[in-house]
Amino acid sequence: MTADQELQIIVRQGKEPNPTVQDERNSVSSSQAEVSHSNTYKRWLRVTLYTFFVISGQTVATILGRVYYDNGGNSKWLATVVQLVGFPVLLPYYILSFKTHATTDRDGKRTSPRNRVLVYVVLGLLVGADCYLYSIGLLYLPVSTYSLICASQLAFNAFFSYFLNSQKLTPIILNSLFLLTISSTLLAFNNEETDSTKVTKGEYVKGFICTVAASAGYGLVLSLQQLAFLKVLKKQNFSEVMDMIIYVSLVASCVSVVGLFASSEWKTLSSEMDNYKHGKVSYIMNLVWTAVTWQVFSIGGTGLIFELSSLFSNAISVLGLPVVPILAVIIFHDKMNGLKVISMILAIWGFTSYVYQQYLDDKNLKKNHEITTTESPDPPEAEESTWQSK
């Protein structure tokens, strides 16, 4: 046999896959697929939990805010404080969980303290002002009108996300935004009003303008949070999410407390408690649980930004807005009419459209990952065999 023939045989043998090596590759590929499937399952489990936090927290907190005003509460700054001051309930969980996540959170470059403080202060100031504007709107507007204007936060968020987060507005997403907005818009045509205190035309206009501004501010805050995770903090992990919630809430709470004392509303709190319709205990419990439920909403909203995007977080928030009139049927004995039913159906339809878009994105990402894996070059076994023959 000539040297050329021997070399051809060796090259052919090198091209033929080694059964042992092939089995190892199949085993590795199978393990990677199982890990990927497990991670996807855990991710969507977290998304489901965060979604429940957003809807339940926002719904209960809004109902409690309405109860506070309807039963004699009148302090706009106190209503702002309770939206923000509940963050200390997270500290025990944050401390206990820090050690568990510390090993993975130390990887990567550290953000400079100056940039980190700047992010928390700017977002905290915006959140504090935003919550105050929402408090004014809830005081002067009917729930149906308030829900209508709050739905506009989704459009504002889509606008800011397009410029700040490079969010692609696909036809499915646009359909989702349209349906979610219409679902809350229908509530404006509801002629049935609650027994809330009558307001003047000037107060109504003030509440309308403040709620529009608050909706725009909320959409901006969500986009800025997502931008901060990607560009400034440059890490998306448990610690960053908890730090974002706690420190932003701390700054915003300081802003609201300063506003409470600067406006002199704190002087009327004692008489407000004494004259509260259901007594002092009910007054205190209302404030405490309002603070807790708003913090649950904050956890869910920030978690959805961390897992998906600010636009998805806002879509879930808008989905929960029609739930408030539904619960009002049970709590305040309001009547359920056709508009409320249609509103809920459209909200669920819009939410389903957005989830379907997320499913398509994940499917395409997984397909691209599989293509990249299959196109990776094999180890140069043939070359090694050839050089050994020489």
UniProtKB/Swiss-Prot annotation:
Chain segments carrying region Disordered: 370-390
Membrane topology listed for this record: Multi-pass membrane protein
CC terms in the record's Gene Ontology section: membrane
Compartment list: Membrane
TM helices/strands, residue ranges: 44-64, 78-98, 117-137, 140-160, 169-189, 204-224, 241-261, 287-307, 312-332, 336-356
One GO biological process term: purine nucleobase transport
This protein's UniProt keywords: Membrane, Transmembrane, Transmembrane helix, Transport
Matches recorded under InterPro entries: PUP_plant (IPR030182)
One Pfam family, short name: PUNUT
GO molecular function: purine nucleobase transmembrane transporter activity; purine nucleoside transmembrane transporter activity
Annotated family: Belongs to the purine permeases (TC 2.A.7.14) family.
Protein name per its UniProtKB record: Probable purine permease 10
Species of provenance: Arabidopsis thaliana
